[in-house]
Amino acid sequence: MKTFTAKPETVKRDWFVVDAAGQTLGRLATEIASRLRGKHKPEYTPHVDTGDYIVVINAEQIRVTGAKTTDKIYYSHSGFPGGIKSINFEKLIAKAPERVIETAVKGMLPKNPLGRDMYRKLKVYAGAVHPHTAQQPLELKF
């Protein structure tokens, strides 16, 4: 019997909506990354994007454990000498709550063109409203 390999044109992708309110950042991000890769499907193939679309709502209500609200620091660099910037979790969640979840999930995906395609299927919104109701996303609980 031959080994099954998923073809990109035959992969069926579903839409799911995840409520991040009260969820722990790392635990939620690992589940989302696994779903984006398609590892929950029997037809998972490492070199084919078999994952689903994930819509995350209420990103502003995500929580972290311990003292990470003040101690967790996000870095960015402009590319120029001395151009490093840092912001802690507390300030970033107030400024751009979507970036917290996006950064956590992106770090758990492959660092190659396939990983970038997987990342594009992640949609994160700060509030409870999202523009993807036409896709009829199913609710996903972790």
Swiss-Prot record:
Please name the GO terms of the biological process aspect recorded for this protein, alphabetically: negative regulation of translation; translation
Q: Which of UniProt's keywords are assigned here?
A: Ribonucleoprotein, Ribosomal protein
GO molecular function (one): structural constituent of ribosome
**Keyword match Ribonucleoprotein:** yes
Q: Which PANTHER family match?
A: LARGE RIBOSOMAL SUBUNIT PROTEIN UL13M, RIBOSOMAL PROTEIN L13
Q: Which gene encodes it?
A: rplM
Which ranges of the sequence are coiled-coil?
none
| Protein role | This protein is one of the early assembly proteins of the 50S ribosomal subunit, although it is not seen to bind rRNA by itself. It is important during the early stages of 50S assembly.
Write down the superkingdom of origin: Bacteria
Write down what this protein is called. Large ribosomal subunit protein uL13
Q: GO cellular component annotations, sorted alphabetically?
A: cytosolic large ribosomal subunit
Cysteines engaged in disulfide bonds, as pairs: none
The family this protein is said to belong to = Belongs to the universal ribosomal protein uL13 family.
What species was this sequence derived from? Pseudomonas syringae pv. tomato (strain ATCC BAA-871 / DC3000)
